[in-house]
Amino acid sequence: MANTFRIHMLKAKTGDSFIVECDNEAFFIDGGTRSVAKYLKRYLQENYLAKLQAVFVTHVDRDHIGGIAKLYGQFSEYVPKTAPIYMNHPDQVTITTNTSGLVTYEDGNSLKEVLMKNGYVLDEATTGKILDFNGVTVEVLSPPSVVAGQLFTEWRASDDGLVSTDLIEVDCSNVPPEPKNNISSDIVNASSIALTIRHAGKTALFLSDSLPEVVLNQIEGKIKFDIVKISHHGSKHNTSMELLRRIDCNNFIISTNGPRSYGHPHAETLARLILSSIEHGYSECNITFNYEKVCNRIKINNLPSGFHVNLIYSETITL
């Protein structure tokens, strides 16, 4: 099992949840919605050879933290206390562990209080932090501490649960206009933890729901990555050509079940991924989805001759 680098993409509905395996070391990145907790628990039960090294909670949106809150609130006996939890502002997440075993957000102690009371180690993750886990290197690209400090308690309304069946038509004839974001008006996503994981000569970039403007400030020149988890489920507002021109990569992950209310993934984002791969000199672009129905809804138009786009459905990627 030496030099293995594997990414498991859990079915987190509108959210994100990843298990990253580097040889016998395992890492959780986000926990999706509450329904994902049972999959995280099952992994800990069944993969006793894989040692959980750390848990990263990228930000406080429900579709990223729900499963983590439930995991620690209801199944904490399966989570080793040796694995630190990296999270900014855990005091803003409240959970209740009651006799019925249900976890809620509206009442109860903060997640920070629950974790500390049960002996877990909490730490912040801001720009510049570099962590080493038995040869696996994790580097935090964002958020800067000044942005993380601006985070206020603002939870997104829950999704309606309806999945779109509409065709996603991607036009590769022109570069879509760049997104225009206001960090102060989207501080929850602006404060998302973006990080890289390096192991066995491979590097993966996880962009969470980060804003391109924030990550751009931490990337100098062009950097090569073996795979990139695209920000905010493929939203057109969170991926820019300016950022992609600094990210030398043609292998991408998009985590979403394609909710009707958000329209993820957006055609503009897919076009940017394809066109940036062409600019970097690749002959193909690989985009992996964790829901097959989303993958099957995409139609690529006006693709340059000789260039190939591989739309892949998979729940596991091995680098």
Predicted regions and their residues:
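Active-site environment of divalent metal-dependent phosphoester hydrolases
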Residues: T14, R34-S35, V60-G66, Q92-I95, ...
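A short acidic (Asp/Glu
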Residues: I19, I65-A69, T96-N98, L216-I219, ...
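Flexible, acidic/histidine-containing loops and adjacent segments that form or flank the divalent-metal
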Residues: Q74-T203, S283-Y291, C295, K299-L319
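Extended hydrophobic/aromatic segments used for targeting, binding, or gating
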Residues: F206-A271
